[in-house]
Amino acid sequence: IGTNRKGSTMDLGMDMWKYFGITHTDHTVMNPLSLEKTQELVGLLRLPEGGRVLDVACGKAEFLCLAAEAYRVMATGIELSPYTIEAARKNVETRGLADRIELLHMDGGEYKPKAPESLDLASCIGASWVFQNHRGTLAALTKMTRPGGLVLAGEPFWMTDPDPEYLKFTGDDPN
C-alpha cells in the first residue's frame, strides 16, 4: 500500500514510487504536457542566459534540459522518487548538462534556495500536492523568485470524467 501526499492510500502491491516509475517508463515528460508542448513552453520563457531555474517534481528533468539547452541557464531539479531521479540523472548526463543542472533527491516542499527571491524561474508542473494545493504552490514558488521573475505552475485535469474504479484505486474517490 502506498500513501500519496494527501494521505490517501493506493493498494499497488508494490512500492508506490516503483509503480509510478513503471507506469512512466516510456514518458519523456512526466507531467500533464506532451514533449511538443513542453518544447513550445520553453521557447516562450525568454529566460536570461545564465539565469537560475528551479523545477520542483522535475521527473526525468526534460523541462530543465530543454531550458538549459535553449538559454544556458543554471538549474536545480527536485524529485522525490528514487527511480525517477536516476532517470533524470541519466538524461542530464547523456546530454552533457551535468555542469548546469543539479538534481536533488528530496521532498520539494522542504527545499529552500540559497537566497530567497533569487530565481529567474520557479516551476512545479503537475505536482501541486508538493505544496498542499495550487495556491500553496504559487505562494511557495513566488517566495523563491526574484522580482520580475517567472512562476510556472501547471495542473492536470480531466477532460472527461475518470472511471470510478480508477479513482477508488488511487484514493481520490470523493465518496
What positions do the PLM features span?
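Conserved class I S-adenosyl-L-methionine
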Residues: 5-48, 50-57, 62
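A structural alpha-helix within SAM-dependent methyltransferase catalytic domains
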Residues: 42, 65-68, 138-142
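Class I SAM-dependent methyltransferase SAM/SAH-binding core
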Residues: 62-110
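A short acidic, Gly/Pro-enriched loop at the edge of an enzyme's catalytic core
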Residues: 113-122
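Residues lining the SAM
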Residues: 124-128
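A short glycine-rich, Lys/Arg-flanked "PGG" loop and its adjoining helix->strand segment in the class I
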Residues: 135-150
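Short, glycine-/aromatic-enriched active-site segment of Class I SAM-dependent methyltransferases
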Residues: 156-174
